[in-house]
């Protein structure tokens, strides 16, 4: 069977996208039924927050559908597999955000719209995930600065270490690593 892996990925993506569409519809319909027919109505702010949650989740579903939906020709043969929805990275974060939105919408339908305050966790999560990237970016900027000064980072660190050693022990001569190793070996064998 030719392209079995691609066909398997296409079927997997189609299944996941169908599940996402069904879950999105069910959660939103349940919200409307529970909030307007079973419980009291919503304030303007609550409607705004619900609209934000629903529209952002729907937008991400649309983007994932565009990127991952398999495309077939008229005969039914696979033309485009689509992006893997189970891969790590931005796709994973988009799916997680959709699940998070659905959970909050469902909980807001059951309890109170104050549950939407948990959306404040999203920027905290973004900062948590972006901190290592920011640290790496700052290190790269530092390396670029060193390159602009025509000093590689290792050479600059060695110079700083040598200056530190010279200031720390001015009376003792600075020994190379090889000399230090030879002295340790000599001291080891000279002891009876």
Swiss-Prot record:
GO cellular component labels: endoplasmic reticulum; endoplasmic reticulum membrane; intracellular membrane-bounded organelle; vacuole
Leader sequence residues: none
Keywords assigned by UniProt, alphabetized: Endoplasmic reticulum, Meiosis, Membrane, Transmembrane, Transmembrane helix
Sequence ranges of Low complexity compositional bias: 151-167
Top-rank taxon, per record: Eukaryota
Subcellular location(s) of the protein: Endoplasmic reticulum membrane
Segments traversing the membrane: 16-36, 102-122
Protein's membrane topology: Multi-pass membrane protein
Chain residue ranges for the region called Disordered: 149-192
GO process annotations (BP): meiotic cell cycle; protein insertion into ER membrane; protein targeting to ER; vacuolar protein processing
Feature: compositional bias, Basic residues: 178-192
Function: May function in a SRP (signal recognition particle) and GET (guided entry of tail-anchored proteins) independent pathway for targeting a broad range of substrate proteins to the endoplasmic reticulum. Has a role in meiosis.
Protein family: Belongs to the TMEM208 family.
Record's protein name: SRP-independent targeting protein 2 homolog
Species for this entry: Schizosaccharomyces pombe (strain 972 / ATCC 24843) (Fission yeast)
